[in-house]
Amino acid sequence: MSREQLSVEIIEAGRFLYGRGWSPATSSNYSARLSATEALLTVSGKHKGQLGPDDVLATDMAGNSLEPGKKPSAETLLHTQLYSSRPQVGAVLHTHSVNATVLSRLTAADHLVFEDYELQKAFHGVVTHQSQVVVPIFDNDQDIARLAAKVQPWLDAHPECAGYLIRGHGLYTWGAKMSDALRQIEAFEFLFECELKMRAVLNR
């Protein structure tokens, strides 16, 4: 897929995710694999519901901008580490929904476990509700290289992992194509909302 086509996919993803309330204001960042050595990412500080062709830039896999005058998101390394370690990944989405943020703060453990939900089958490789979807939660850290170093061992040990939360911050998920990553965002958001409602009903 060409740069122009990937840019359109990123722009359309931003409009969709902003419209759902999952990427408010200038939060969040999105990317697509441009080649084996380059990624296309949203420029830092841009409103995700109002992205245009100039609001994306190419970076190398170390997170360095390849376009003078354009600054990548501070969290670029969390995108490129997925492209580097998982050749099948073609798109990465990071969102800041209310449900993801609140649930990550309410959960004292370092992970969430979802089971017996039919919608688990929306995740790549899951074929039955009689399974577990484990979502790790990493503490937020302004030092992105240090945060990436904490995430990588989990990714290496859990090839089935479909996404993770950063506490008080948001969700990262990915897919072979942008449509796959968007599908998983929707599935995660459904599960997060169910979990919060279950906790409210059970008063825990």
UniProtKB/Swiss-Prot annotation:
GO CC entries: cytoplasm
Gene3D superfamilies (UniProt xref): Class II aldolase/adducin N-terminal domain
Entry keyword annotation includes Metal-binding: yes
UniProt-listed InterPro entries: Aldolase_II/adducin_N, Aldolase_II/adducin_N_sf, MethylthioRu-1-P_deHdtase_MtnB
GO BP term (any one): monosaccharide metabolic process
Catalytic reaction list: 5-(methylsulfanyl)-D-ribulose 1-phosphate = 5-methylsulfanyl-2,3-dioxopentyl phosphate + H2O
Molecular-function GO terms, alphabetical: methylthioribulose 1-phosphate dehydratase activity; zinc ion binding
Binding site for Zn(2+): H94, H96
Note accompanying the cofactor annotation: Binds 1 zinc ion per subunit.
Pathway where this protein functions: Amino-acid biosynthesis; L-methionine biosynthesis via salvage pathway; L-methionine from S-methyl-5-thio-alpha-D-ribose 1-phosphate: step 2/6
Keyword Glycoprotein recorded: no
Function: Catalyzes the dehydration of methylthioribulose-1-phosphate (MTRu-1-P) into 2,3-diketo-5-methylthiopentyl-1-phosphate (DK-MTP-1-P).
Family: Belongs to the aldolase class II family. MtnB subfamily.
NCBIfam families: PRK09220.1, salvage_mtnB
Protein's recorded name: Methylthioribulose-1-phosphate dehydratase
